[in-house]
Structure formats: structure tokens, C-alpha cells
């Protein structure tokens, strides 16, 4: 088990930034025995985390299709090879705000031998990110497709084929190009993605995913949430997400609830809005 109630947000956010930063997908192969005591699972382990598994499909589609455009600019700093290999001298001054909006990285230098072209570093990104954060409280990527609201702890993905509203979104409204998202839960990860190479606007089928927190039955944490006191047992309990999503396209949709195998279980409640949007509850 993994004592982190908000871990569902990890996969779609990492997938989005892999596109922005042009990171190559990495496969972690490992063996793991079953254990009896409480332990903290690895970040990439979806086997025992149902909310992560539920979002693996949309996260994979985003990465494979390249839904998020690559940043064409970035901010870089130099670091010596000796400093890079030291746990004491390895220090960088890349602002966190810049990391949210564009590529960042280092150029290794040693005896005038340099790996990477530091002249490609866009120094203006530091002031640009700082000004944006100060004036709006939000950080929007240079591509315009990713937005982090630092104050309200929310994250938006807004591309042609995948859109999402993630984080502590309860009581707020995520306004995206093809979807308006409103959730009553304090924390949720809600994504809408095309199931083809077409955009959401033109897709024949869409996948709407809505997950939140989870825990084992009778699982207990310390008051600060940093320590698991009781691991609990099966069945795993997943929080039901309540609210609605307005799909703002010209299509007429049927909406179905799916089980863990992707099979239809029942029709979801829908309602046509005056502006032509289809509201799914």
C-alpha cells in the first residue's frame, strides 16, 4: 500500500511534462515480494493503487501521441563535472517557477570541455516566470497548454486531444477549450481525452476519467498524514467523485459508466445545455 491519498495526480502530470520537456519514456522493471508490514510503495507502482491504474490509459495516450507540445525555449545553467558528482557542492539556482513553464537543464563543464550549448539559455524566462506568478498567481507554460495555480493548488491540461483539471479543485470551475469541469470533492483528477488521433472536437469516442482519493478498509494515518498507523485490509475504498462536466462541442453524446475492464455497466446521466454543451453528471 502507498500512504499517499493524492497520488492519482502523478501520472497525468508527469505525462504532460514529458511532452513539454521532450523526455523519453522510461520503463522500470523490478521484482517485489509481498510484504506484511506497512511500507511506502514506489511512485511508479500502479499494481496496488487503483486510482493510478484508472488514469494509466489517458496518461499513456498523452505520452504516446505527443498531445502536449514541446517547449521550444528553455533556461539552462552550467555545472562542473566534479560538482555534479558531489552531494555537497552540487547546487543550482534554477527557479521553481521556470521549471513549470519551459525546459530547464544543465551544461556540464570541466577544463573548458562543455557538454551542451549554454548560449541557448533564455535568460528572460526567469523574470517572465517571476512576473507572471506575482501578477496572476498562476504559471502558464510557454506553449499555453499547461497551467499551475500555485495559490489554489490546481493544475490544468488544455490540448486538442486531452484536457484535464487536477488537484484541490472542489468548489472551483475548470474552464478548458472543450470542457468545463466542476467537482464537489476537495481533491480530484478529472480528464477528458480523445480515443483516436482526432481532436476532442472531432473524435467519435471520448474517455472521461474521474478519480480522487483511496484507502484500504480501516486504514488509519497519523494526524499529520505522514505515517500509516494501520494498513487496513481489502476491499480498497475509492472516493466517489460528484459534480459535472460540460463537453462544449457540437456532438450529441451517449455516456456510459465503465468497469475496471472497460466494459459498460450503466448509462450515465446527461443533460443538453442551452449553449449546446452536453452535461455529464
What are these regions (language model features)?
Residues 88-133:
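Charge-patterned, long linear interaction tracts outside catalytic cores
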Residues 115-281:
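C-terminal beta-sandwich/jelly-roll accessory domains of carbohydrate-active enzymes
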Residues 1-102:
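Catalytic-core region of carbohydrate-active enzymes that cleave or remodel glycosidic bonds
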Residues 7, 15-18, 24, 56-59, ...:
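Generic serine detector
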Amino acid at each position: 500500500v502507498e500512504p499517499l491519498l493524492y497520488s492519482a495526480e502523478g501520472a497525468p502530470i508527469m505525462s504532460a511534462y514529458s511532452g513539454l520537456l521532450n523526455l523519453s519514456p522510461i520503463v522500470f522493471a523490478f521484482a517485489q515480494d509481498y510484504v506484511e508490514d506497512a511500507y511506502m510503495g514506489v511512485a511508479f507502482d500502479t499494481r496496488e493503487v487503483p486510482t493510478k491504474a484508472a488514469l494509466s490509459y489517458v496518461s499513456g495516450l498523452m505520452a504516446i501521441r505527443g498531445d502536449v507540445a514541446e517547449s521550444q525555449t528553455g533556461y539552462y545553467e552550467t555545472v562542473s563535472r566534479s560538482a555534479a558528482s558531489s552531494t555537497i557542492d552540487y547546487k543550482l539556482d534554477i527557479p521553481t517557477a521556470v521549471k513549470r513553464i519551459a525546459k530547464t537543464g544543465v551544461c556540464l563543464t570541466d577544463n573548458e570541455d562543455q557538454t551542451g550549448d549554454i548560449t541557448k539559455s533564455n535568460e528572460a524566462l526567469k523574470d517572465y516566470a517571476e512576473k507572471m506568478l506575482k501578477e496572476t498567481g498562476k504559471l502558464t507554460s510557454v506553449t499555453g497548454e499547461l497551467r499551475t495555480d500555485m495559490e489554489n493548488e490546481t493544475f490544468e491540461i488544455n490540448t486538442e486531444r486531452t484536457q484535464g483539471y487536477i488537484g484541490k479543485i472542489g468548489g472551483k470551475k475548470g474552464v478548458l477549450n472543450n470542457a468545463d469541469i466542476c467537482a464537489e470533492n476537495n481533491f480530484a483528477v478529472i480528464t477528458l481525452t480523445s480515443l483516436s488521433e482526432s481532436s476532442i472536437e472531432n473524435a467519435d469516442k471520448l474517455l472521461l476519467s474521474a478519480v480522487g482519493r483511496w484507502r484500504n478498509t480501516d486504514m488509519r494515518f497519523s494526524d499529520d498524514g505522514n505515517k500509516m498507523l494501520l494498513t487496513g485490509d481489502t476491499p480498497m475504498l475509492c472516493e466517489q467523485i460528484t459534480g459535472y462536466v460540460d463537453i462544449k462541442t457540437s456532438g450529441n453524446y451517449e455516456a456510459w459508466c465503465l468497469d475496471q475492464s472497460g466494459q459498460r455497466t450503466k448509462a450515465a446521466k446527461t443533460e443538453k445545455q442551452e449553449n449546446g454543451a452536453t452535461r455529464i453528471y
